[in-house]
Amino acid sequence: MNILRASQLNNGGNMSNNTNNNMNSNMNGNMNNLNNRNVGNNRNIGNTRDVSNNIDTGRLQINVTSAITSFPVADATISISYTGVPDATLEQLRTNSSGQTETIELDAPPVELSLNPNNEIQPYSEYTLNVTAPGFEPISISGTEILANETALQHITMNPSEPDETGEEVFVIPGHTLYEEYPPKIPEPEIKPVRETGEIVLSRVVVPEFIVVHDGTPNDTTARNYYVRYRDYIKNVASSEIYATWPANTIRANVLAIMSFTLNRVYTEWYRNQGYDFTITSSTAFDHKWIPERNIYTNISLIVDELFSNYLSRPNVRQPILTQYCDGNRVSCPGWMTQWGSKALGDQGYSAIEILRYFYGDNMYINTAEEISGIPSSWPGYVLSQGSTGDKVRQVQEQLAVISGAYPAIPRVTADGVYGPATAEAVREFQSVFGLPETGTIDYRTWYKISEIYVGVSRIAELV
């Protein structure tokens, strides 16, 4: 793994001291000008500091994989610049054998800005990433969002290059829903009637492996459909709808609402029953905001991995509840959860279910899906660790052996059904590569992450 600072770049990428100083001066000046507006009106953020001259930092890690094989892309080069100054490189990173860069720190606006519902200043900084790799088409992502004190994860998929092709794929990430203006949600009944003859409805609640996202309004025939892994979709939506700086239980409550809404669309086949060929849209007027190639955040990712098989229920109702919400500041929505209101309750120590019941009523419950699609075997219900034995251990060892073929940093282990030090080390390295707590034990999150990566890697291997 290599990381080149701006001052170390070779010919063609050098940044002079004057350029560096000018950029720092410009950013400081812009922050000062922005922060001098309306800071005096900030409230509900506790004991605050003076943010008018303050710049915080956030963190960024980049993961690069092949769009065809899902294997990591080693030795990819990523040049990072401010989105507003795209030609002046701040950092240049290279991916390791796992397709990952080092985690770096980048300037971000003060954390207080993302904690105040009355703030009018953009609370995140935006960066442009230009990515190249031998044998792949270059890709540019403009608008990666860095929040103070949080780690942003930017997943990038690269297409193999074709002969005589010199084009660059470009993604421009629009602003966050809590900062930019988006259409408010059109109200719908939270429980969908299922009466029409021939209507497609699932017999039980199933967590899908993939969903089809229509990147526009339902009737926009020019919008593209994307096949997205369910968990990746939820992480993307949560990162687009709320700020990762918010309390953990606030994030959990919002993730549960997002998942229940989404699983209602899956369970009722809402759009397919209207003749469409997708599961859900990216329009805030109809569904949630989902953005192709946007970054997510480590804490949101871990919470989704913790909760992804859950949804919200009411007594004697089989389908997941269509839990609608709004920001609660620019838009009001009686009877729905408000995002800023959920943040205030999280600040007061409310649990996730307490937050949800505050908005949706006391008869709202957290339920678990009967089936998770696309996995070889369900979670055994207990943590696997050194000393564990049996078929579940052997199964994980076999899966890790397959995964290590694509991710050589993960040591290959013998599938003997005994969870010894070698297995613990392989699990620990797997957790390091995929952003999980490095415990060396297999809990719920690690079990399903191993299953997800194994299915992706082995499915491609079968096709080769």
Residue spans for each PLM region:
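Short, solvent-exposed loop/turn segments that connect beta-strands within catalytic domains
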Residues: 84-88, 122, 405-409
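Conserved, single-site charged/polar hotspot
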Residues: 1-55, 75-77, 94, 100-106, ...
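A short, solvent-exposed loop/turn motif at the edges and junctions
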Residues: 111-142
